[in-house]
Amino acid sequence: MGLFSWRDKELDLIANQVEVDIKNNYKTSALENIKWLEETIDEKRANGKLKGKAVGEYQQMVTNFRNIVNNTKRTY
């Protein structure tokens, strides 16, 4: 069991896309991908593929992303 064995590759890919959207100031795309991330977390939790610490970590990630997006102003 590795140091980050709780990580889920699919969720990490979606989270990475959200980060890219935020860095590029693509607020609409970031919000869509945050929703996708939440839905995927819920689906994996319901199927038993995501448990315990991982659920909390990914939910915290979603909360952080939402806070960043809500505090970001469009620059165009």
Region annotations inferred by a language model:
Residues E10-L13, Q17, W36, E57-N64:
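Charged, amphipathic alpha-helical oligomerization/scaffolding segments
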Residues V18-N25, I41-G48, T72, Y76:
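Secondary-structure edge/capping motif, primarily at the C-terminal ends of alpha-helices
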Residues K35-Y58:
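Short, charge-rich amphipathic alpha-helical segments embedded
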Residues Y58-Y76:
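Alpha-helical linker/edge segments of TPR/alpha-solenoid repeat scaffolds
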Residues M1-E32, N70:
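N-terminal acidic leader/helix
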